[in-house]
Amino acid sequence: MTVLRSMKDFSSMNITASILLFVTAIAAAVIANSPAASVYQEFLSHELHFRIGGFNLLSHAGHNLTMIEFINDGLMTIFFLMVGLEIKRELLVGELSSFRKAALPFIAACGGMVVPVVIYSMVCAPGTEGGQGLAIPMATDIAFSLGVLSLLGKRVPLSLKIFLTAFAVVDDIGGILVIAIFYSSHVAYEYLLWAALLYVLLYFIGKKGATNKIFFLVVGVVIWYLFLQSGIHSTISGVILAFVIPAKPQLNVGTYIERIRRIISTFPEMGANNIVLTNQQIAKLKEVESASDRVISPLQSLEDNLHGAVNYLVLPLFAFVNAGVMFSGEGEVIGGVTLAVALGLLAGKFLGIYSFTWLAVKSGLTPMPLGMNWKNISGVALLGGIGFTVSLFIANLSFGSAHPVLLNQAKLGVLSGTVMAGILGYLVLHWVLPKRR
């Protein structure tokens, strides 16, 4: 029941967040092609600074971060921190915690990463300017895809939601590795050394029982700055930070229950005035609050705290500054990169996830989970083509300001591929899932 309830809560949040993300992306595209386009571009290139004496936190290579750089390299680190926390949780106690659980989604995710890259390379050959975007169609947007799946409500088997979540998490791991390995340059190892020392410090402090999330986040900001200067993409700092945040609570559940029972048994009874609590009652309630805080691990607590900020602030801002596709202007609006990305997300993801899942089950390597069948897997495989967030992120890393025409084509490919995959995935699942009685 706990798993089912948490999936329901998560799905409800994802529906709202997905709608907000979609609306924000549409707004960005409309503004980018309106008379206000120049204002939009000025907003993206507006320089920011955060000075402490003569030190500017928001600077890199001698210049201030622009708004789009701050959102992509700064705020998106919060998103990747949350992704890292989700990955760590899944590896410890979730669907990736054992070979039996992880095998099918891992194999499906591998197919969902390999085949899109192959299809992309067939359209835009490696070694060409367009070939730099090979990794763009690899990603699956967890929140967006689960949001679409959740529109089907109780008709969706829990196993199907878990399968989609698990292979999307593996996709994220793949995307993070690609960013770390292929989109880093001119590494300044002295900055990385200082960052590594701070990670080690946080790890041992966590082992000693420290649970103050603010402390971990403040040190995380310092590490983020060191990564920003190092040449390794700064968002990776958030992922690594997640793995040094303690996953073990200060109180185990058994001790917590005993403590709460003891507090309740000694809770002062209400007097004649039953509106205002007595000081003794307030003290007991604070004991309950303190115990409740200590039974939730820093990892779970921080993940819960970040969901709202990421879904309703960070990702909408990211969509707004990155989804402003130009439908007119210099160069081809629709080109080879557009086709490569869209086909990679729509056809590549479907073929990769479905075929690798089929091979894994038919070979006897892993059983088909209860509640899943080849029809509903086909729908979820299509939803895997909802790349959006990480795909747009990798598109910016692939082409950036050096190739604005190709970047615009890539963005159009991501948006069109994501929309088509979402619509087709929803329609297929609507047809094949059991009708609500």
UniProtKB/Swiss-Prot annotation:
Places the protein is found: Cell inner membrane
Keyword Transport: yes
GO molecular function, one term: sodium:proton antiporter activity
Main location, first listed in the record: membrane
Catalytic reaction equation(s): Na(+)(in) + 2 H(+)(out) = Na(+)(out) + 2 H(+)(in)
Transmembrane region(s): 12-32, 65-85, 103-123, 133-153, 162-182, 186-206, 214-234, 308-328, 333-353, 377-397, 412-432
Annotated InterPro entries: Na/H_antiporter_dom_sf, NhaA
Record membrane topology: Multi-pass membrane protein
A cellular-component GO term for this protein: plasma membrane
Keyword Transport: yes
GO biological process: regulation of pH
UniProtKB keywords: Antiport, Cell inner membrane, Cell membrane, Ion transport, Membrane, Sodium, Sodium transport, Transmembrane, Transmembrane helix, Transport
Functional description taken from the UniProt entry: Na(+)/H(+) antiporter that extrudes sodium in exchange for external protons.
Recorded family membership: Belongs to the NhaA Na(+)/H(+) (TC 2.A.33) antiporter family.
Name the UniProt record assigns to this protein: Na(+)/H(+) antiporter NhaA
Source species of the chain: Bacteroides fragilis (strain ATCC 25285 / DSM 2151 / CCUG 4856 / JCM 11019 / LMG 10263 / NCTC 9343 / Onslow / VPI 2553 / EN-2)
Gene this chain is encoded by: nhaA
